[in-house]
From Swiss-Prot:
Part of the SecDF-YidC-YajC translocase complex. The SecDF-YidC-YajC translocase forms a supercomplex with SecYEG, called the holo-translocon (HTL). The chain crosses the membrane at residues 34-54. Belongs to the YajC family. It is found in: Cell inner membrane. NCBIfam families: yajC (TIGR00739). The keyword Cell membrane applies. It comes from Rickettsia bellii (strain RML369-C). Residues 125-134 have a biased composition (Basic and acidic residues). This is Sec translocon accessory complex subunit YajC.
Length: 146
């Protein structure tokens, strides 16, 4: 009988019982919501990137295009290679300008090479300096009269 008992134990050890499981449908709303919530940080990062980098760069580009398009004969300019000169010839049909860098020394440069119109910058600087001096004079004269 002991041999039959061992055989029945061996049969019990060799068998694996599989239990039935229920198939539960996955809720589609939860997966859709989790997909949208993971998309929100990416949208925020793009928005920050746009407002901190792309938008200011676009503004600077437009200002530069306006500056280059308004160059006139007789203005003092600075090129991106560091050359100061006075514009002697501007052509609307060509992208070039002629700049006099010394007496009877003229070079051709691209309009896009203009970094600054220094004669305009000087005018603005002089106006700011004058307004500061006027304010100081008013303060000094006001202090002396009292």
């Amino acid at each position: 009988m002991s041999t039959n008992g061992q055989d029945s134990n061996a049969n019990n050890n060799d068998t694996i019982e599989i239990q039935e499981t229920e198939v539960v449908p996955v809720e589609t709303t939860n997966s859709l919501q989790s997909g949208l919530t993971s998309l929100i940080p990416m949208v925020l990062i793009f928005a920050v990137f746009y407002f901190l980098l792309l938008r200011p760069q676009e503004k600077r580009r437009k200002e530069r295009e306006k500056l280059v398009s308004e160059v006139k004969k007789g203005e003092e300019v600075l090129t991106n290679s560091g050359i100061y000169g006075i514009v002697t010839k501007v052509s609307e049909s060509e992208p070039n300008i002629e700049v006099e860098i010394a007496k009877d020394v003229r070079i051709k440069a691209l309009k896009s090479a203009i970094v600054d119109i220094t004669s305009r910058s000087k005018d603005v600087a002089v106006k700011k300096e004058d307004s500061k001096n006027n304010k100081k004079d008013k303060k000094v004269s006001g202090a002396k009269s009292s």
